[in-house]
């Protein structure tokens, strides 16, 4: 597989926020989101065998949480699926973060899918494969990264229309960060004020989780390897 980086940090998103986690970040993405914070994954990386990747993961921690991310990791599905199965068989709790643009049917059942449905302001709205809803299980999660009120309304209606609260364990509404965010560790970098987003969720009585990218408040937004 083509790998951009492997490192250990704290999980900064999803319902697993705050838990120590090994991140295996795969190279390449077929989307170009307006607010993308990982453009460095689009090209480059290094070719690694399954054994080499597994050895690096074990060196960082013999067990615990592993997230497969990117880029879009399912672009390398053929090699990735057996690797995820190996991690699960070795006792790791495995998450995969994906846009849902690629089919999800072959992701192992024990792997938690964290699906980032793209909102209109991302420039990739409509990229989600609606048939992937049938591949979701009760332990999976869906995330919407929200840049403005229109994005919020899209996420709200998508959630209601498809009954997501009853389909997955968590539906997460997260404010997008500015692409040029640098230096300070505060909410001023968010494209939509987290307080506004919280108020909208409360006003509409949505059964969703407000998610902040915690790592961008612990470290600076541009810091890599965290």
Curated annotation (Swiss-Prot):
This enzyme's EC code(s): 4.3.99.3
Residues involved in S-adenosyl-L-methionine binding: 71
This protein's UniProt keywords: 4Fe-4S, Iron, Iron-sulfur, Lyase, Magnesium, Metal-binding, Queuosine biosynthesis, S-adenosyl-L-methionine
Keyword rRNA-binding: no
Domain of life where this protein originates: Bacteria
Keyword Metal-binding tagged: yes
Cofactor dependency: [4Fe-4S] cluster; S-adenosyl-L-methionine; Mg(2+)
One GO MF term: carbon-nitrogen lyase activity
Protein residues bound to [4Fe-4S] cluster: 29, 33, 36
Chain positions recorded as Mg(2+) binding sites: 38
CC cofactor note: Binds 1 [4Fe-4S] cluster. The cluster is coordinated with 3 cysteines and an exchangeable S-adenosyl-L-methionine. Binds 1 S-adenosyl-L-methionine per subunit.
Domain Radical SAM core: 16-221
Pfam families, alphabetized: Fer4_12 (PF13353), Radical_SAM (PF04055)
Catalytic reaction(s) noted: 6-carboxy-5,6,7,8-tetrahydropterin + H(+) = 7-carboxy-7-deazaguanine + NH4(+)
Enzyme class (EC, first level): lyase
UniProt-listed Gene3D superfamilies: Aldolase class I
HAMAP family on file: QueE
Protein family per UniProt: Belongs to the radical SAM superfamily. 7-carboxy-7-deazaguanine synthase family.
PANTHER family named in the record: 7-CARBOXY-7-DEAZAGUANINE SYNTHASE (PTHR42836:SF1)
Name of this chain's protein: 7-carboxy-7-deazaguanine synthase
Organism: Koribacter versatilis (strain Ellin345)
